[in-house]
Amino acid sequence: MDSIVTTEDTIAAIASAISIGKGGVAIIRVSGKDSINSCKKIVQTKSKYAWESHRVFHGFIQENKQNKFIDEVLISVMKSPNSFTGEDVVELHCHGGIIIVNKVLKILLSSNSRVRLANPGEFSQRAFLNGKIDLTQAESINQLINASNTRSAELAFSGIQGEIKKKINDIKNDLINQLCEIEARVDFEEDFTDFDYTKYLKNIKKVKEKIELLIENAKRNSYIHNGISIALIGKTNVGKSSLLNLLAKKEKAIVTNIPGTTRDVIEINLTINDIPMKIIDTAGIRETSEQIERIGIKKSFRKIKESDFIIYIYSLEEGFNEEDKKIIQEIPKEKLITILGNKKDLIDCKNINSNELKNTILMSIKNNDGERLLIDTIIKKCGLKQVENINIFLNERHLANLSACLSNLNDTDEIIKNKLPFDLLSIELRDGIQNLSKITGQELTEELLDNIFSKFCIGK
């Protein structure tokens, strides 16, 4: 955008993290056409650089006209259009205690009728509307703020630098080139008998491969940011709670030889290989008349459906029997699963049936023998063995629009295959381009934009 979108009101909010209630410095951000004048009303300063753009100067916050100072601050000014939002922006750097920062914000709001508290994500929304950032960059800022590990933060920062936009525009340009050739023929009513269908299908196949790779990466990098939920499933006394304690490096679950000890779900959050994981210990599955235990078993099956990954544990002493097979048949086919044979220290592994060994990890949870292999297997099956190859983070909104575009391109294949009118090709390509444009924010309704930015924190 070349022009700056102006709004009648000026917004203000605490822009720094204050979740623990105190810190060395807190920042109050003010944006809008009245930001400088509103701050002048509450700031006393003798600096010769006062209120110049891209200057930081010293001052005091004044509570009333009696010159009662309540805090000593640094003030930075960024005048339109050279600011994050594209508007005039002032940032007040005050001391970080929750009491004082709220006091400064209250004084600012009460002294200026044209200044109001910002809505969640409103600073970023104004930056987007003023063309300072595209929608993927705005979402990446929120992603970075909420990153739960360093890899997630790295992926978010690549989005801030415009990597998502680059990949989407690359695909979009490919489709625009195809659309131009087709529409030129439609507009001039040229004969399509000499149209190179093979070349077109080859080009579209390349575009679809790019989209499919992004979709595949989107599924994997969701694990990086949101974590992998892993349910420990199996019969009673096979070592589920012991495995939970082993992974947690502390006793989180009670372990006894009495069947049915675990009657409720126990969850712990860990970070392994810089990937967040939620480990879920469930009640042992068996036939029982005990009501509380039966409730726990129902929860076990519920967690099977809710989890990303299943570790099915059985005892090598007992072997993998019909009861185990029956339980595994209850696990949805699409679920990622690893079968773990526990208590290898109690048997001679040479005597294990070769069919039982297939796709099974042998482990002694008691002796911590096999933990590394188990973790490596989880990471490999989740497609995270080479996370360095994943260089952008795509969220569910991006994924939905990419999938819609892919559907449009598949429809063009059907149009050619069934020799349908050529103008239908143009329609599908236009729809595909529109779905890609929604990702960067070029084709979105105001209502949808409000919904996206409402998920941001206040102050960003």
UniProtKB/Swiss-Prot annotation:
One GO MF term on file is: metal ion binding
The record's annotation in Gene3D superfamilies points to: P-loop containing nucleotide triphosphate hydrolases, Probable tRNA modification gtpase trme, domain 1, tRNA modification GTPase MnmE domain 2
Q: Where is the TrmE-type G domain?
A: 227-383
Q: Looking at the UniProt record for this protein, which Gene Ontology cellular component terms does it annotate, in alphabetical order?
A: cytosol
**Which domain of life does the protein's organism represent?**
Bacteria
The cofactor(s) it depends on are: K(+)
Binding residues for (6S)-5-formyl-5,6,7,8-tetrahydrofolate, per the UniProt record?
A: R29, E91, K132, K460
Pfam annotation, one family: MnmE_helical
Similarity-based family: Belongs to the TRAFAC class TrmE-Era-EngA-EngB-Septin-like GTPase superfamily. TrmE GTPase family.
Q: What does this protein do, in the record's words?
A: Exhibits a very high intrinsic GTPase hydrolysis rate. Involved in the addition of a carboxymethylaminomethyl (cmnm) group at the wobble position (U34) of certain tRNAs, forming tRNA-cmnm(5)s(2)U34.
State the name under which the record lists this protein.
Answer: tRNA modification GTPase MnmE
Q: Which organism is it from?
A: Prochlorococcus marinus (strain MIT 9215)
